[in-house]
């Protein structure tokens, strides 16, 4: 069994009349992990985030606050710190699209680490073995979450906010694979395609094609939400909207 060590238990966080514990783990196989949890949680949300977000914390707490305002069911959220997004979240190697850093192929290792962590998180926070697990994220973390839906049976729902579906080779992959998750949320800003980058400019076309592919899958519940603004506006709120929709579908199911 995977064991989490070096917990730094923080003061309780009050949110919408609900009290949360905030636990920080300084080291695990990928990096630091921040867990916000209520007593007797019934669902586990997992989200890869940048290291700076773990340190700053304010935006993550605001995201949890938004989810808690909409969902009455108690839950736990594990924010997983990712040091090198281009390496650790990319499903395969690809040349740089912006900046100088090429994309690596570390997504499979990151997925394996997260899957290894799930049983210990459920044990530590008193979640039942069959409690639903939701994976989500923003930008490349959203693409990683979407890719994980195709590669793993570990997740009941995927919240992919502004996923990098322009990623080289992604749609070719999605056309010949089938997602294992039953619920997939997609969203995009309505101005995300307003960019000079010729590859990223295709994102609106790509997200619509991705959504159309998901709509052909039997049983799968999916939606595509359009948010006002470009890629860099309100990421926490957009992630919260995705998790809320996924939780609502699970509760309805």
Model feature map: region roles:
Residues 64-65, 148-149, 211:
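A conserved amphipathic alpha-helix that caps or lines the catalytic cleft of carbohydrate-
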Residues 132-137, 161:
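Short beta-strand immediately N-terminal to the catalytic nucleophile in serine-hydrolase-like folds
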Residues 136-141, 145:
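Gly/Ala-rich beta-loop-alpha elbow adjacent to hydrolase catalytic centers
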Residues 1-43, 75:
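A domain-start/cap signature at the N-terminus of enzymes
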Residues 164-246:
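The feature captures the conserved acid-bearing segment of alpha/beta-hydrolase catalytic domains
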Residues 39-116, 120-126:
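Serine-hydrolase catalytic machinery in alpha/beta-hydrolase-like enzymes
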Residues 46-50, 162, 188:
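The conserved beta1-alpha1 loop
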């Amino acid at each position: 069994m995977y064991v989490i060590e070096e917990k730094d238990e923080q003061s309780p966080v009050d949110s919408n009349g609900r009290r949360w514990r905030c636990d920080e783990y300084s080291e695990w196989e990928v990096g630091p992990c921040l867990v916000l949890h209520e007593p007797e949680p019934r669902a586990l949300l997992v989200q890869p985030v940048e290291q700076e977000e773990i340190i700053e914390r304010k935006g993550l707490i605001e995201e949890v606050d938004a989810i808690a305002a909409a969902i009455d069911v108690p839950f736990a959220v594990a924010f997983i710190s990712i040091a090198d997004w281009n390496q650790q979240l990319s499903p395969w190697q690809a040349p740089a699209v912006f900046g100088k850093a090429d994309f690596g192929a570390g997504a499979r290792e990151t997925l394996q680490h997260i899957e290894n962590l799930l049983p210990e998180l459920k044990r530590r926070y008193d979640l039942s073995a069959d409690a639903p697990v939701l994976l989500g994220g923003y930008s490349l973390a959203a693409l990683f979450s979407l890719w994980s839906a195709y590669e793993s049976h570990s997740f009941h729902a995927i919240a992919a906010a502004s996923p990098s579906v322009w990623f080289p080779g992604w749609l070719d992959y999605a056309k010949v694979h089938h997602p294992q998750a039953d619920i997939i949320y997609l969203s995009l800003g309505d101005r995300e395609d307003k960019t000079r980058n010729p590859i990223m400019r295709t994102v609106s076309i790509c997200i619509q094609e991705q959504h159309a592919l998901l709509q052909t899958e039997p049983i799968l519940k999916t939606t595509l939400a359009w948010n006002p603004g470009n890629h860099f506006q309100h990421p926490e709120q957009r992630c919260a909207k995705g998790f809320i929709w996924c939780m609502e579908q699970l509760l309805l199911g």
